[in-house]
């Protein structure tokens, strides 16, 4: 099973790095499943390498883990001011490579023309996900759901 997991990791990461136009990493640098991509990659290709790396692990967990699959949270994927070609690749990559039946929470200032075919929540208050006017409603809803867990 270990060999299957490691093989899957290498295959996925190699494929994802190519899709995201990351060519500066050698296979020897990312071949070990314990490698730390963030310390090996610099510049504008670093965010793309990290997205490839994280999505590889999302797919590994989906395929090989029996535990509950958590939502994927990607905040501001346009790091290091990607050029237009690369930000397009990043957005399309996220859209096309989200593991099947997974929930994605994507924090974006702009969609760059990619239709993620999902519910969009527009935040209107800086540094706030919830609005003060909604606290009581959300509190009641959450208490109700938590109470159901204990029944």
Where are these regions (language model features)?
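Conserved ABC ATPase signature
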Residues: 31-54, 77-85
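Hydrophobic alpha-helix feature that most strongly marks membrane-spanning transmembrane helices
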Residues: 62, 78, 82, 95-103
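Extended helical coiled-coil dimerization/tether regions that scaffold
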Residues: 1-42, 63, 67
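GG-anchored amphipathic helix commonly corresponding to the ABC/SMC/Rad50 NBD signature/C-loop
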Residues: 46-71
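C-terminal lobe/lid and adjacent interdomain/linker elements of RecA-like ASCE P-loop ATPase modules
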Residues: 87-151
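Short, well-ordered alpha-helical segments
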Residues: 3, 7, 11, 47-52, ...
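Domain-scale terminal segments
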Residues: 41, 67-68, 84-85, 100, ...
């Amino acid at each position: 099973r270990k060999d299957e997991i490691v093989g899957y990791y290498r295959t996925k990461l190699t494929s994802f790095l190519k899709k995201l136009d990351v060519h500066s990493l050698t296979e020897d640098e990312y071949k070990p499943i314990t490698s730390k991509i963030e310390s090996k990659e610099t510049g504008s290709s670093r965010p793309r390498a990290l997205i490839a790396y994280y999505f590889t692990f999302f797919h590994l967990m989906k395929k090989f883990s029996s535990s509950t699959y958590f939502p994927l949270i990607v905040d501001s994927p346009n790091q290091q001011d990607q050029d237009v070609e690369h930000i397009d690749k990043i957005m399309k990559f996220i859209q096309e490579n989200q593991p099947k039946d997974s929930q994605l929470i994507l924090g974006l200032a702009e969609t760059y023309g990619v239709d993620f075919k999902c519910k969009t929540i527009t935040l209107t208050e800086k540094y706030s996900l919830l609005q003060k006017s909604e606290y009581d409603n959300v509190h009641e809803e959450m208490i109700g759901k938590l109470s159901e867990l204990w029944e």
